Amino acid sequence: MARLDTALRGVGHPGLFITVYDSDIVTEANIGRQLFSPSDIGLNKAQCLVTRMNNFFGNDWKAVPDIYPAALKDARRDNLANITITCTDNIKSRLDLWNILKAVPVSEYRSHETPLYWMDFGNTQDTGQVILGTVPKKIKQPASKLYETVESLKVITRYVKYARVKEKDSGPSCSLAEALEKQDLFINSTLAQLGCNILWKMFRNGMIEHYGLYLNLSTLKMNPIPV
């Protein structure tokens, strides 16, 4: 996201302001799979990463060492954004977030507090998906003679009937070897790159032809989801 922000600024875009929410701390199991070092152990993940990105790129992004509000009554104006990105292994948090986003009244698209898009990342050990959906029922698109525009994209909760899924908490991993049994080494970073590429196309070109993808890292196959 920091590279995306830097590239956008380089082509005249005002850039991004990002707030990261995470209540977890860095453990030994995170070293190697993610960009954490042994000196980061014990630090809050959000604060650690945002501080590093701010120092490296000169940004003023915000870190919140807590979970995202679980209900609209607990959310403040600064909890809302035009694009919400989730990378969670918890089904309930997805459902809670969707209930919040769809309950926020759409005032105007130019307000940074109006939820417009929700991008969700999910994965198993070596497979995963990225889905970019629209929060409002419709987002008005400009008239085009070249393309057939689409005003609505399905969010992840409309793809998957999470209410029917029985969630089992796998618990925290105590070592890198144990963590790799649950998530392969490059599945998270590969999905992150591909998801950011969708956002890059959207910002850079003002349009996207694919709003998601399915990835199988063991077979090196990827299936894009066309608009």
Segments predicted by a language model, with ranges:
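Glycine-rich phosphate-binding loop and adjoining beta1-alpha1-beta2 segment
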Residues: 13-60
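A structured beta-alpha segment of the ubiquitous adenosine-cofactor-binding alpha/beta core
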Residues: 43-81, 88-95
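Glycine-rich phosphate/adenylate-binding loop
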Residues: 6, 88-227
